[in-house]
Structures are given as structure tokens and as C-alpha cells.
Amino acid sequence: MESMFSSPAEAALQRETGVPGLLTPLPDLDGVYELERVAGFVRDLGCERVALQFPDQLLGDAVAVAARLEETTGSKMFILGDTAYGSCCVDVLGAEQAGAQALIHFGPACLSPPARPLPVAFVLRQRSVALELCVKAFEAQNPDPKAPVVLLSEPACAHALEALATLLRPRYLDLLVSSPAFPQPVGSLSPEPMPLERFGRRFPLAPGRRLEEYGAFYVGGSKASPDPDLDPDLSRLLLGWAPGQPFSSCCPDTGKTQDEGARAGRLRARRRYLVERARDARVVGLLAGTLGVAQHREALAHLRNLTQAAGKRSYVLALGRPTPAKLANFPEVDVFVLLACPLGALAPQLSGSFFQPILAPCELEAACNPAWPPPGLAPHLTHYADLLPGSPFHVALPPPESELWETPDVSLITGDLRPPPAWKSSNDHGSLALTPRPQLELAESSPAASFLSSRSWQGLEPRLGQTPVTEAVSGRRGIAIAYEDEGSG
């Protein structure tokens, strides 16, 4: 138990310091990191200062990449590492502190739009794909040539999807290829209608077609994620895909396939459990998990309104990356809600090492908004932007007089009947309103006070005026190992 809250003392003596060695051979550096394309991006913008953001696992190549780019572009490069939140998000705050005019993001990315206008280029590090093995795996999982199927992949394998589709199209008639949804530059206008954008990908659907009609074939996993259950990108797709459609995955190295239906069922069951925990909760901790993704302020205000409407008390916590040791300092909080990008919001849920559940914003929406989800939509969204006004999935809170608030609700965890939420005015910053009683007493309902009264130890209690006054008497003599009145037995 001690190791969950602190590192052992000998870890400091055994820790190896210094910069990790070069991960990629120098001759392969240009191809792996697409340095020619990146250099062209920098020269076209005419930037003098550029930030290079690397995740922890790629920092070994950062110095060599920065030196090569400075040599080819003449611009000053700044390396960003150890981001305060998830490394998959663009660190616009770190780039601004360095005075950078553009940012290059290397490694896995959630492709969430940044909160502030900044030219950004993404380098996903292309991963080799065994196309012939993937074709055989696809044919084994999809024997019907007329069945509609979408080709999906992890970001590092997206470059091979068109080549895979070219090999499959002579036999399969209804094949759709997804592509990464890179954020559009601020103020840019597209001459053509944008395709459907969901799960960080774009889907060029034909007119009249819906994504819910398609099954899915996912290329990725294994090498990038040894444990598929801990892969937030695949989990996001499994949660959001239509429950009645087939979903299979394929390893790009070996062609090994797996039907993901059972895993999707487990993820949805876990999400339903988390929604029930949120409905039972009285105190909710809102964790600020990002400061660099667009609309994070609006989403935080939306979540606070949700908890207030549902009669729950909420606290906003800015702790950086959530860890079990940090969140264990708040035992009064029943559930935490992590406001982060889609990948960052799912990662703590999949780890399973926290003392209290960590929810995604859409799970809190399902728990606190009786009008959500809208008809025909399963509550399996993964990005908080889908909950805000302007999104096709946004559903406003019902008015206080709506019958939806009075619908009887029984907890599936405790079996108790949940009381309807008590609406509070916006200027009430304390607990529920004080109510006069016939005996001229005041009754106060406070989740914090209820939690304190249930604790076995409530701190030092002065008990002023409640302790009888007695004369001072002689205490025990000696030391703890042998007091004088204990004898020598």
C-alpha cells in the first residue's frame, strides 16, 4: 500500500540520469520524422522560432531532429517535453512561453483543435503495414462482399489505408476509407463541404448514407499497445461505434485478427456502471485535464451547471496529470470527472488503479441531464465538445418545472430510491437553503457535513464546556517500556 503513494527510498539511488540515447539511426531520421515536409512547412511560414513537441518515449531523438531542422531551415528550434497534461495534445502554452511562431507535434496525437491560434504540423511517425496479411485478415472477417465496411487504423498506420482499399475494392463493393481529421487552420475556408468528422477521423460518406450502417475493420495495436484494453484510441472507437455493427481489429505486423464485440460490450457495461455511480454521487470533483484544447472553459462551465442542476456539489481541481496519490487526498469526493481530450479522458478509466471512479464528461451528462441522450443516440460520445451548444448532440437541460426531474429513479448499485434534485439559485454558494422548522430550528443539508459525521475520526475536538473539571492527579512514572506501576513481570 505504501508504494502507491510514494517511491521506495532506494529508487533515488538506482535511477539513471541523463538524456536517453538516440532511438532512430541517423540515416533513417529524415524518413521517420518526415523532416523534408516539416522543413517546407517552416519555410513557407517564414518562422524564426519553432517549438518541437515530443512525447517522453521519443525524447531520445529530439536533439538530433532539432539540429537537422535548424541546419535546413535556419530557424531556432525549441524542444518541448514533459507536458503538464497528455502529450497527445498540442502544448500551445509551452510554445507561447518559448515565443514560438509555430509548433511541430511528433508522435501519437488526439488531433484536438488547439485553444489558441497557432500553426501546427503533425508528424505521426509512419508504421509499416503488411498489406497482404491485412487483406487476408479482412477477407476472413468479412466474407460478404456487399457488406458496408469502414477501414480504420491507428494514426501511425493511416498512410496505408488507401493502398489496402485498392487491393480490396475489386471484390468489396461498399468500402469506406477514413482519414485523420487534422485541425483546420483558424480562419481557413474549405471550397467543398467537409466530410463527416468523428472520433478524430473524417468519413467521406455518400449522400444519404449514415455511419451507423457500416461495420469496422481496424488496423493497429499490438506493437504500439501491448495490452489492447489499455489503448484509448481503440477504446474510443469501440465505445462510439454502433452497437449492432461488427467491429474487428488486425495487427499490421502479423495480420492477426480479433473480433472486438466482446471488448466493446465490456467497455459499454463499464460506462453504464460509471453513469450509475455518478447518479449516486453527492460530491463531484471536476479535474482540469487540459488547458490547450479548444472550448475547455465552456465545457467546464457546462459541467458545473450540470452538477448544480442535479443537486450535486462540485469542486474544480487543477492537479496536472491525475494519479492515485493525488486524488487520494480528496476522500470526500464520490466521483471525479476528467475534462480532457478524448484519449486523455479515457486513459485513467482503463488503468483501474484509482480509489474513486474517473468519468468522462459525457458520462456525467448522461447521469445529470434527464433529457440526454437524444432519441436514437446511445450515450457513447467521447469528446466534451459534442455536449456543448452548437453540436448536433447537444441537449439543453429541461426547465425546473419539467416532469423529467420528478421521474422516480432507483439506484442499480444500492437499490435505494434517489430523491429528485433540489434546484438552487445561482447566488447560492453554500449547501442547500436553510429551512425554518416549527420549533424555530434551522435544518441544513450538506454533503461535506454528512461525510464528516460518517468518519470514525473527525479530528481534534475541543469539547468546550462539555468536559467536567477535576483536580490534577499524579500521572505514571517511568518510560514506555517499563512504567513503575507495571511491575517487572
From Swiss-Prot:
Transmembrane segments: none annotated. The modification Phosphoserine is found at S7, S446, S456, S488. This is 2-(3-amino-3-carboxypropyl)histidine synthase subunit 2. Required for the first step of diphthamide biosynthesis, a post-translational modification of histidine which occurs in elongation factor 2. DPH1 and DPH2 transfer a 3-amino-3-carboxypropyl (ACP) group from S-adenosyl-L-methionine (SAM) to a histidine residue, the reaction is assisted by a reduction system comprising DPH3 and a NADH-dependent reductase. Facilitates the reduction of the catalytic iron-sulfur cluster found in the DPH1 subunit. The keyword Metal-binding applies. The modification N-acetylmethionine is found at M1. The gene is DPH2. InterPro entries: DHP2, DPH1/DPH2, DPH1/DPH2_1, DPH1/DPH2_3. Pathway: Protein modification; peptidyl-diphthamide biosynthesis. It is linked to Developmental delay with short stature, dysmorphic facial features, and sparse hair 2: An autosomal recessive syndrome characterized by developmental delay with variably impaired intellectual development and speech delay, short stature, abnormal head circumference, dysmorphic facial features, and sparse scalp hair. Affected individuals may have other abnormalities, including congenital cardiac defects and distal skeletal anomalies.
